[in-house]
Amino acid sequence: KGDISIANGKFGFLDIPGEKSVFIAGPNLNTAMDGDTVLVKVTKESVNSKSREGEVLQILTRGKSIVIGEYQQNDNFGFVRSRDNYKDIYISRKKKKNAKDGDLVAVKLYFWGDSERKPEGEIISVLGDSEDTSALIKALLINSGITEEFSQEVTEEVGKISENIQAEIANRKDLRDLDIITIDGEDAKDLDDAVYVEKNENGYKLLVSIADVSFYVKEGTELNKEAIKRGNSIYLVDRVIPMLPRKLSNNLCSLNPNEDKLTFTVEMHFDDKGKLIKNDFYRSVIKSKYRMTYTNVNRIIDKEDEVINEYKPIVKMVNEMLELSKILRDAKKRRGSIDFELPETKVVLGEDKKIADIVLRKRGEAERLIEDFMVVTNETVAEKLFWEEIPTIYRVHEDPDKAKMLTLNETLIKFRYSLTNIDEMHPGKFQAIIDKTINLPEGYLIHKLILRAMQRARYSNKNLGHFGLASKYYLHFTSPIRRYSDLIVHRMLAKSIEKFIKDKEKDKYMAAFDVISTSISKTERVADKLEEDSKKIKLVEYMKDKIGEVFVARISGMNKNKIFMEL
């Protein structure tokens, strides 16, 4: 039993946690479609590491009733060919809407087909030409059940939220006089986090102030229900689909400069070796002094006079931030945290929504600095909630699967590297190989293979540790505007501080967080795939007029049928 995935409308796979996948040939799908929950009979066991084979016995739950595909017109009727379905979908003349041959369409099914008849449906939306990128991205969203607009109930609820926070400010620690700053990408509008560092004779004081979304988004509201459903914001190549309406994500909650903002602050004191000496947690009000970008902070670090003169009041603090981040990074490395150095491309669109540039996204000291501060903040909050036995949602990354480690080791040995004692895996073993190969020709491939062999991080109501970070306690606290997990953590941290949780409530929260963890882990996977697929659509459009040209490429993977390359 499980959810089936259909590949190219030709065959399917059933993935069952802890077991080998089951391959299902097209004729054995028995009307199952992508995303359906099905009961499968295994007809052939795995041989030589191949998948098992099976057939669908029963459709338990239909994953969706709306299917995306390309419309094909015949004389008196039409068909929609979908990658999510083995059989074409019959469309009568009356139910074709205004679709033309070759259009990308959304079809609502009213008959799923049987052994004698094809599935039947009605076209509910004509998205456009099947090669138009805006139509293809729209199709991605519909196919994943993503709605851009918020319901009228949510919109009305948000409209009633007051922008006046003066009464609340009196209840908070006032940090408005401090030179607190935000550091984000140039195009970021949902500014979650602000930072402040002060060097003293004992070491460093770090304040990380995070937008207090929980002040605005209350449990039991329509807004909260919608946030749970969305789970996270989605950053497509051409747009952002926010978890929260823009009045909150880009305005009330966003830590825009020179505005009073409600925040949740984690105050941490470190010695000069990066050891946490003491901490404090409190609700606060801040007024960010500068909306800094990674680019400008990197230029300050590189000692460029023009930028140093522009941001003179915070230059000393930025340099102290750099000192502290390097100390924290070294401490992370000593305990074995894995740090992948894999190149990432950023697609830049012009006003016509076509690719204007493709740039290699580099991780400079500013990016690392914020990453270091956010990681240590997440760890600090996680450890507090764990030892106080406060229910919450953790970000967990489990130990690698032994079978995958054995396969990885076979490849590493061919490159004259190896993992020792696979029964006792430690992240430091992987980091040692990464360090050795970082500047070698085979380094890129080895780092990718190690990454693919890792488990996928997920959310859980149980603290299972974070293997990649070598952390005993970890969660997500620092981005509540765009991740629902962080909003949960804020609420539970508030209960911890205010001693506002009774023992009999803990079981209720644990059960609720178990369900929510599963849901938001799934919405995160959907968002990641949508973000990657939308980028691929634009890249394919960009390469259309380059057919026949010769490029230097790097082989990034292969199987018995294909070789994958990166330009």
Where are these regions (language model features)?
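Short, glycine- and charge-enriched coil/turn segments that flank and shape catalytic ligand pockets
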Residues: 18-20, 45-50, 94-100, 160-172, ...
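Feature marking long nucleic-acid-engaging regions of large polymerase/nuclease enzymes
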Residues: 25, 107, 184, 191-417, ...
